[in-house]
């Protein structure tokens, strides 16, 4: 499947769908966050000039098929910055390199903003990120769920 990666600021019509995907995929990690709050957080990334920054993978037909956000910090490790967050690809679109392409583009965006490294945590996709050049930093817990903290250089 052919796709391009755009800043959410350039395709804000996809904001509600991306928020719904994030809520469905990651809501269990922080159940107190409502869908409306996710939408509000995404609205903060409608400027492509700094953080937060959200990227959307868009098919040639114009449909969103994945998204990822670059955040300045995370609740578990506020001393590390920035963070690749909420990478989500709908089940029907998985296995086509979309998540890997999004994570690479996030690293490039972090480099553009002057960051030498970018971090992430993942509850269940560490092997996918290892194949894309990420290294494990440590194992941690987020609201009782085990997560892998990973890092990669932004010089790709």
Map each language-model feature to its residues.
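Hydrophobic alpha-helical core bundles mediating ligand binding, dimerization, or RNAP-core interactions
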Residues: 15-26
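Conserved hydrophobic beta-strand within the GNAT/NAT acetyltransferase core sheet
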Residues: 87, 118-120
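Active-site rim helix/loop that mediates acceptor-substrate recognition in acyltransferases
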Residues: 26-59, 69
């Amino acid at each position: 499947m052919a796709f391009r990666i755009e800043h959410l600021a350039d395709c804000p019509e996809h904001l509600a769908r991306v928020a719904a995907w994030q809520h469905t995929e990651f809501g269990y990690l922080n159940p107190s966050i409502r869908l409306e709050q996710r939408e509000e957080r995404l609205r903060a990334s409608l400027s492509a000039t700094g953080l937060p920054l959200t990227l959307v993978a868009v098919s040639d037909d114009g449909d969103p098929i994945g998204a990822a956000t670059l955040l300045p910090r995370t609740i578990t490790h506020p001393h590390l910055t920035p963070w690749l967050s909420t990478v989500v690809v709908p089940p029907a679109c998985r296995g086509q390199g979309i998540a890997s392409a999004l994570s690479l583009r996030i690293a490039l965006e972090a480099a553009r903003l002057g960051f030498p490294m970018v971090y992430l945590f993942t509850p269940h996709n560490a092997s996918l990120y290892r194949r894309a050049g990420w290294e494990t930093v440590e194992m941690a817990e987020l609201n009782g769920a085990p997560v892998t903290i990973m890092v990669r250089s932004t010089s790709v």
